[in-house]
Regions:
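Conserved Rossmann-like nucleotide-cofactor binding loop
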Residues: 11, 142
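Nucleotide/phosphate-binding catalytic cleft detector across ATP-hydrolyzing
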Residues: 1-10, 16-137, 147-150
Length: 150
């Protein structure tokens, strides 16, 4: 099984693929000025898709919904969801939620506030299972999150 984790940032698109058959991980990052044109995101996703080849599932976090090209955060989330589900089969795409679960397209669109800017939460939730007392610092191109974990 192969799973790609995507982080759609405000200026960069990051993705890592995990191959559970041979336990190999491959990562890719592309500068992606989404605020100039949403098509930059589409082209970047397709570039990484072509680099990684076929995979079974896609797990997505985002902060790009906050860039100026979108009228508001909700519209940005919906646009990004729809874009992903046009490139990949909808049944293979899941969006990380604040409830520590993954939502399919329909539920993600109905719960945009629960998936908007959840990249920090995904990292903090994962780390908290292994380290009980620390500070997570997530420095991106457009946001910085400082999260105490206790």
């Amino acid at each position: 099984m192969k799973i790609v984790g995507w982080d759609i940032g405000g200026a960069n698109l990051k993705a890592s693929i995990i191959n559970f058959k041979n336990y190999k991980i491959k990562s890719n990052q592309i500068y992606c000025p989404i605020w100039l044109n949403i098509d930059n995101l589409r082209k970047s996703i397709i570039s990484i898709k072509n680099n990684f080849g076929n995979c079974d599932y896609h797990a997505v976090t985002m902060t790009a919904e906050l860039v100026d090209i979108f009228k508001n955060k909700k519209k940005g989330v919906k646009k990004i969801i729809e874009l992903f589900c046009k490139i990949f089969p909808e049944k293979k795409v899941f969006f990380y939620s604040i409830n520590e679960n993954f939502l399919k397209r329909k539920d993600a669109i109905l719960n945009t506030d629960n998936i908007s800017s959840m990249n920090w939460h995904a990292s903090a939730s994962f780390i908290s299972k292994y380290i009980k007392n620390c500070i997570l610092v997530d420095i991106g191109s457009s946001t910085t999150d400082i999260v105490p974990i206790k």
